Design a protein with these regions (language model features):
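Active-site-proximal alpha-helix that buttresses catalytic centers in soluble enzyme cores
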Residues: 1-332
Length: 332
């Protein structure tokens, strides 16, 4: 019998501010980034982490892998697309270790050509001779929604007690360029509410599923936290590359909420599984300051990080993947 493992795939992040130029070249497939963009991102990294200038993403992802390995009783490897340990290097090591079957799970729950598709390509490029089962997306996994709700519920209660206001929830996911998902830009600044999801779901079948899946995750979490006064959805952290990115942006949505009289907001990202710069800077610093300027108290729940429910969700996905590998072997 061959050796079977789990491979967790993640975005990756540099360990120091000085490594950011190399990291950004990886993100944009070797293209040069304008110097002012590099310097701005270096500035953001300089404001986060312990010590300052350090993103905890790599350590937290490795911890998630270790917890999953303990829960499963099976080896778990972790590979990053844009930084060390690179996916290609990890898969090469797996081959050297005698691995014959791989259950690959992307730590971006919502399926997209800009995440899952690229991670799949990177993993398969070095996996010759292995049996591979790739989890395409798990945006509607109930345990994932349970994990987010477990973090959200106390944050809503705490902000309500602190402000005396009815608390609205703003769910977010990372924006992506419209060209990558064949989606029109949303630029009117209006919050995306649940009815919009049904309209999106009726789009052309070849449209990237990312935006719809992100909103479905949000809806599942919202159902589990009925004590919130209401919720809406926006896309965060739009990049500097040319062309429009999907929206509406968080800033435009917060403006619309303020105009509607909202005073207290808990912002919960549903596409991120651990702390990194888009949480520790974009949300904790930039969005919080922006909201304060609108008269809104904005808070964020604790990230999933080492959540036991997240570990259970990943374990469930891995077991399902192992079953598919068994079925594929039986058919041969």
């Amino acid at each position: 019998m061959g050796k079977r493992v789990v491979l967790l795939l993640a975005h990756g992040t540099p360990n120091t501010v000085d490594e950011i130029p190399e990291y950004l070249r990886n993100v944009v497939s070797g293209r040069a980034m304008p110097q002012h963009v590099v310097e701005e991102i270096q500035h953001r990294y300089s404001l986060i982490g312990e010590p300052k200038g350090h993103s905890p993403l790599t350590e937290l992802t490795m911890e998630q892998g270790a917890k999953l390995a303990k829960r499963l009783g099976e080896p778990v490897y972790v590979g990053m697309r844009n930084w060390r340990p690179y996916i290609a290097d990890v898969v090469k090591q797996m081959r050297a270790d005698g691995v014959t079957e791989m259950a690959a799970i992307c730590l971006a729950p919502q399926n997209s050509r800009t995440s899952v598709g690229l991670y799949r390509r990177a993993a398969l490029a070095e996996a010759a001779g292995m049996q591979v089962d790739f989890t395409e997306g798990w945006s509607e996994e109930p345990l994932l929604a349970d994990a987010f709700a477990e973090r959200l519920r106390p944050a809503v209660a705490a902000l309500a007690a602190e402000t005396g206001e009815r608390v609205q929830v703003l769910f977010t996911a990372h924006s992506v360029p419209c060209r990558t998902i064949q989606a029109p830009a949303v630029s009117d600044g209006q919050p995306i509410l649940w009815p919009t999801l049904k309209q999106d779901a009726e789009g052309a079948p070849n449209v990237d599923p990312y935006a719809v899946e992100a909103k479905r995750t949000a809806a599942m979490v919202a159902e589990r936290v009925p004590e919130a006064a209401g919720w809406c959805f926006a896309f965060q952290s739009q990049g500097a590359s040319g062309g429009p990115w999907i929206g509406p942006a968080v800033e435009a949505t917060l403006e619309a909420m303020a105009q509607g009289g909202v005073k207290a907001v808990v912002l919960q990202p549903v596409g991120f599984l651990c702390d990194h710069v888009e949480i520790l800077y974009d949300i904790d610093i930039a969005f919080r300051e922006f909201a304060a300027g609108l008269g809104i108290e904005l808070r964020r729940p604790e990230s999933l990080n080492s959540s036991a429910l997240l570990t259970e969700a990943l374990a469930k996905l891995a077991r399902e993947s192992f079953l598919r590998l068994d079925e594929a072997t039986a058919r041969r």
